[in-house]
């Protein structure tokens, strides 16, 4: 709506001629600045349409110090075109925000169902053959149904005192993975793992008192066996043959609350000593007789003595790794911290020498192509001169093909063509490369002026950890969900699927635990919902971090005076602005990525289900779909990232921002490709050099090749353990810094494109870009403004 004409003080009116009373025409309408607010006050911007456009007074017309009215200086006029300061903002994509809230409520319901139906102890604690959890006092009669009645009340925590799972026949579950998943042998919960080698044949000639002593301290039996009644070898042999008592034991150690032979994980004694002393089953078999129920030592270990020596020595590998970490933790932290400092220094180097590094990389590529082409032509000419012939039949020696002139002729042609193409491309886009160098330099300045941007990524990183923990916890609860089923024994002592159900918590004789009954389809779809929630929230957290950083870097770009106009705590301000107005848009963009991710997971699931299918057409179709959706995900990530930058600048909804950013990029596609490739080269060089450098440094230090005076030398079992940790930590630190740098480059680039398209350097629409960028573009502002 047009505003009423009002009389303006003469001190504020400035026309291009010496007479005054004439007002300049309104500036061209910007599709973005149509939303700007122009309050009716002298310190605020004037309306865009059908209103007087106020210009700053000339310095020689009304001096600032004696001006009666508020004189609009060039800097103040420029601030009026800052989209972050004078853009009308409101809540965007409210429906998506509401949908996101409803979805989170649904996730809470899924978590509640998992907690109500599940029991993670089923996955954490081992279970015996009766599906009783070792180390846990479950309650319920089926835990103690074979015990005397008084034991139920006097030893209620009996299974909490039996934390370890013992396997009767180790040869049936010697595989570690099989042991974790269960094996086809009797398993019972015990107070401690066997501490000696034993064969029941040792008791062939033993007295009743000796048998009673062994039954009490050495022999393991199921709970339904009354050991006090076993006084003869014949009775013990009958129990062993029926699988009620163990036929042998080996010296074992607990690993993940399961008893495994010490010979596998901790060969305390020399292998030859073990195999030739009383501490072996072979010795017991030679001494007390052979039995099919008692395996050989080699069957127990599953490996020969030579392999055992090479794999296991004085201590378990885990103990050695823990020892190494305890000895080197502070050196490791120092090296990782040094990697962070190097990452920061690299950002400074990119600010000072970014252009040099870029052009140096370009000239190195040109030099390599030129050298390759020249060498190939010389080699081809020499081979032709010596009369070499071409013979491309099969040759076992691959080098023979490089003694044929045609091979070098093809290589020479290829490298020459690549050299010409690369040279022409460089000549064509040389100005755009200069723009990319200047933008990278500006991004480095922005990071240097706002050091909080380097610390901020820790906030979304912690949120990512929280989201992952929530997803993992809910997934575990859902995976462990199910109803415990107990049934009464039949008269023959067996339990069938048709047997009468009974209450597992009831103290009923004959009530037997038979397993867990699950609603497989329901749990499957709840897991899908949980996984989709993980994808959506992860993308949401990433988007929130991106839009906060984009807002901070945009505030730096659009600030006329970089020292005074950049707001205090720019990242926190941008984050607050995003959470106040743009949560719906963030939810919308992250929803798109999450949908594509879940589709890719479903395609992988279908491919896994059809893994044994011989239908080539179906497999090819699935492969094409997976490839297409991967490309689609990459495209949407690129699109949403630029949309978040536009949202941070103008505060529009997601669709409008995505459309504006996409059209802006397509109008400047060559600049976009060049900037992204050039920035990618610099970031790759930075990550590679920092990670490789810290890896080499840690190798020389932890391997003892580099001795530092005053620092004690460390003796390690596996010096590669701290090296791997340093390399991973260094890459993480470099990635943390360079992700911020990448966002700074992308935001600065979008702001630069907007600035170059919407402004023309006039008094009405001055450029906000740096003087270096203005020189590259060959333009300037009519009145130089503060750009420091």
From Swiss-Prot:
One GO cellular component term: membrane
Pfam families (alphabetical): Choline_transpo (PF04515)
Record membrane topology: Multi-pass membrane protein
GO BP: any one term: transmembrane transport
Keywords in alphabetical order: Glycoprotein, Membrane, Transmembrane, Transmembrane helix
Residues spanning the membrane: 98-118, 329-349, 352-372, 409-429, 458-478, 531-551, 583-603, 620-640, 679-699, 718-738
UniProt subcellular location: Membrane
Top-rank taxon: Eukaryota
Glycan attachment residues as annotated in the record: 276, 497
GO MF term list: transmembrane transporter activity
InterPro entries referenced in this protein's UniProt entry, alphabetically: Choline_transptr-like
Annotated family: Belongs to the CTL (choline transporter-like) family.
The protein's name: Choline transporter-like protein 1
The species this protein was found in: Caenorhabditis briggsae
Gene name per UniProt: chtl-1
